[in-house]
């Protein structure tokens, strides 16, 4: 019987053929926690009586949400993870010394391997499917179970095939493609499904765009997002010191898909998701008619804080200034990305344009710090969620967009089209 990539990954892990809808218990290749979710997992771990991690090298803690600590409470919370990491001599512990947002840092470190089953106590763990792995977010107690046993159970998800065809026009990126998918199927259109992204348009999408695609699978309710390994993936992996040998899986022709969605990307304009759902997508042409003044622009996050995003923003910002009434905050996703941006002269461009460049952190995205919105303020953001109060006051508004739209809007002081600057 024909299988999808996701079914093949689970079959390989349990060592017999499995299909969508079946319940399986499987080993976990990588377990990921952060400074917010791991303390709960640690408490459950200790309450169980466990003394040792089942697979220490397959457990990573990435301190990224409130690091450096924003207040005493977050400092005490971070201390729980630090103490645990030091007690267990954790190999994959990433703090200020080597910091970054977990879903950018893990692939950068070679800790995501094609064919893996990965779980993380963070909903955007689905990002790692861009490297041909099954990767999904779970709760902190689920994480604790994997810490103790090295395993977890799943219902093998059915798959929705998303086929992108055509060549994307200028300033169309993975962010626009996934916002269009969510616009079409809604925030629950892929509930507990694997979103498999494919089609001839994939050859035009670099790894950064692919990470954006898979990152926001959860915003359509998806259990995971996944992309088969190709030459672009292999080129990315060649520069990484992978922790294990990759296993490449490909869907069989004739595999069973619950739904097939076909999108001609050549017809897409940049997409902006209006408040208060990622499914409220509008084309930039529609958005321009609203002539919306913007108070803040944020470029960063695990969705769009990678080097290509910073390069895109820098090309638009070079020689220009952020609008008088608008703030621009730029947050590189990892220290390595920040260093590369500095070496390329991007930091000079940002500062000269009037931007504030912060350390890597999830802070602004979740309304934690480093970019919180006040009452009634509007923000164009390259993040992944725009729910009520997501980035600050409940009356504030977040408009999700790609990095080019964000940079152009910072200059104009309102939602702007980067193609006409």
Swiss-Prot record:
A molecular function (GO) term: 3-isopropylmalate dehydratase activity
Q: Which cofactor does it need?
A: [4Fe-4S] cluster
Q: What is this enzyme's EC?
A: 4.2.1.33
User: Cross-referenced CDD domains, in alphabetical order?
Assistant: IPMI
Q: Does the keyword Lyase apply?
A: yes
Q: How is the cofactor bound?
A: Binds 1 [4Fe-4S] cluster per subunit.
Q: Does the keyword Amino-acid biosynthesis apply?
A: yes
**Annotated residues for binding of [4Fe-4S] cluster:** 302, 362, 365
Q: What does this protein do?
A: Catalyzes the isomerization between 2-isopropylmalate and 3-isopropylmalate, via the formation of 2-isopropylmaleate.
**How does this chain assemble?**
Heterodimer of LeuC and LeuD.
Family assignment from sequence similarity: Belongs to the aconitase/IPM isomerase family. LeuC type 2 subfamily.
Provide the protein name.
3-isopropylmalate dehydratase large subunit
